[in-house]
From Swiss-Prot:
Job of this protein: Myristoyl-binding protein that acts as a cargo adapter: specifically binds the myristoyl moiety of a subset of N-terminally myristoylated proteins and is required for their localization. Plays a key role in ciliary membrane localization of proteins. Required for the establishment or function of the nervous system.
UniProt-listed PANTHER family: PROTEIN UNC-119 HOMOLOG, RETINAL PROTEIN 4
Organism: Caenorhabditis elegans
Family label: Belongs to the PDE6D/unc-119 family.
Gene Ontology BP terms: body morphogenesis; chemosensory behavior; cilium assembly; dauer larval development; feeding behavior; lipoprotein transport; locomotion; negative regulation of axon extension
GO MF term set: lipid binding
Name by which UniProt lists this protein: Protein unc-119
Name of the gene this protein is made from: unc-119
Length: 219
């Protein structure tokens, strides 16, 4: 009975692709130096991003770093307790090359909006569908770090497994959300878009993609 009530009360989320990122939260001089040092490196590794003290101010690699032509085509979030789909988005088929390049740039920064009770969910399944280019991928890894202002909420670390060349792949990652205090949830609801995430994608321990998102919980 409780699961049925929860399923009915959680409205589907939404996503937009703003042309500009909001001004990042204040950071220490050390954080700026750390990010600058990473940008000066020839190769950024998982250990590098895990050592960052906060959300990044910008992107740590350009779209051209994606030499494997990894393209995410579908994304869905569902509540595993109720099987209720909370959010779903898919790229249209048969896009022109010019449109694909523009989408690759705009999709690097997404703004999500969910209902307040999204913060009370315990376990969520995130299904992604993606394509790869002519080169097989043997070690594809994602590290996703979520912050509220300057506080680290959770760090997720997922492996995608082997991907054949010119293949379309899909997998579901399980997100176990941290238990948040009522005061923290209220702060996150009352400060839309101050909850942010960095999603870092690595192939053979080298950063090839970096996406950013912010979140509001006032839908």
């Amino acid at each position: 009975m409780k699961a049925e009530q929860q399923q009915q009360s959680i409205a589907p989320g939404s996503a937009t692709f703003p042309s500009q990122m909001p001004r990042p939260p204040p950071v220490t001089e050390q954080a700026i130096t750390t990010e600058a040092e990473l940008l000066a490196k020839n190769q950024i590794t998982p250990n590098d991003v895990l050592a960052l003290p906060g959300i990044t101010q910008g992107f740590l690699c350009s779209p051209s770093a994606n030499v494997y032509n990894i393209e995410f085509t579908k994304f869905q979030i569902r509540d595993l307790d109720t099987e209720h789909v909370l959010f779903e988005i898919a790229k249209p088929e048969n896009e022109t090359e010019e449109n694909l390049q523009a989408q690759a740039e705009s999709a690097r920064y997404v703004r999500y909006r969910f209902a307040p009770n999204f913060l009370k969910l315990k376990t969520v399944g995130a299904t992604v569908e993606f394509k790869v280019g002519d080169v097989p991928i043997t070690h594809f890894r994602m590290i996703e770090r979520h912050f509220f202002k300057d506080r680290l909420l959770k760090c997720f670390d997922f492996e995608f497994g082997f991907c054949m060349p010119n293949s379309r792949n899909n997998c579901e990652h399980i997100y176990e959300f941290p238990q948040l205090s009522q005061q923290l949830m209220d702060d996150m609801i009352n400060n839309p878009n101050e909850t942010r995430s960095d999603s870092f994608y690595f192939v053979e321990n080298k950063l090839v993609m970096h996406n950013k998102a912010d979140y509001s919980y006032d839908a």
